[in-house]
Regions:
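Charged, terminal alpha-helix-loop-beta segments
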Residues: 1-129
């Protein structure tokens, strides 16, 4: 089955939305099954920044453009809203009233998403720990 993903009216061609949905399904399932604590969720999406790579000019241009487009597409998505939809769907369809509406809102409010390169990641990690 060929599925296309869109955000803000734009087709996501490089950002792997299917993978992201799988990650968020796993986090939401863990919360609803009480396998994870209900606390701050800082989702860090690590994307390798290839700008310093030494490549042939045409290859470098292609690799850099894919990286830039992936970052752009990633920034189109409201991940807190996507997580809210996934958590709500699983609660209603699979897990029932394991969480109150207040608990759900607290979890959703505590969700953050950060796109990080290999250079930004260590600094960001230090800032949240």
């Amino acid at each position: 089955m060929d599925i296309e993903y869109f955000s803000c009216g734009e087709k996501l061609e490089h950002f792997d939305m299917k993978q992201m949905i799988c990650h968020l399904l796993g986090i939401a399932t863990g919360i609803l099954k009480k396998e994870f604590e209900q606390k701050q969720i800082d989702f860090i999406y690590l994307l390798y920044d290839p700008t310093e790579l030494e490549l042939a000019a045409d290859t470098k241009e292609l690799v850099d453009s894919i990286y830039e487009r992936t970052c752009y597409e990633c920034n189109l998505v409201d991940f807190a809203t996507l997580f809210h939809v996934i958590l709500t769907f699983l609660k209603e369809e699979r897990y029932g009233d394991v969480l109150s509406n207040e608990e759900m809102e607290k979890i959703i409010y505590s969700f953050t998403f950060t796109l990080a390169s290999q250079e930004f990641y260590p600094m960001f990690l230090q800032s949240i720990t």
